[in-house]
Amino acid sequence: MSDSGAEEPRVIGIISDTHGLVRADVHTALAGVEMILHAGDVGGDDVLDELALIAPIRAVYGNTDAPGDPRLSQSIELTIGGVSIHVSHGHEVGSPTPVKLLERYSADVVVFGHTHRPLIAGGGGRLALNPGAAGPRRFDLTPSVARLTIAGGRAKAELIPLLA
């Protein structure tokens, strides 16, 4: 708490589709976050171990992750600072779109991956957030991650391009 009695903002790192690669600038992009949420297609324990050097990590399965990994969940549901968050890879709805995901999940923030396309969409106090793919460059898209800031019971997302 600050001197004014207001709660300090909570900042969560959001990453997806690493496919076995943690780029060097992920450490800078996610520095200072209290937790990292990984939306699947992790690509192995080495990725989770390296991300855990930045902050505690929770991750879900993607369509390319081996089933049965005890460090990966089907989905994650949590509440931080009064904001409910759902994390899944997105492939469970076929081709994930913000409309499909916001209809399927009731959370304030729905985090997904799979498409490799960074996206922040929503309305009515709800967000669909895809941080983009942080791993190997595919589909001529710039790799990226996101930071989710929660303050006053509201969430705001920022996409961060990865250059290295």
Residue ranges and their predicted role:
Residues 161-163:
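Well-ordered alpha/beta subsegment
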Residues 14-16, 35-41, 58-63, 86-89, ...:
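Active-site neighborhood of phospho(di)ester-bond hydrolases with catalytic His/Asp-centered motifs
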Residues 58, 91-158:
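Conserved beta-sheet core of the metallophosphoesterase superfamily
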Residues 25-29, 79, 99-103:
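Short amphipathic alpha-helix with an adjacent loop that forms part of the alpha/beta core around
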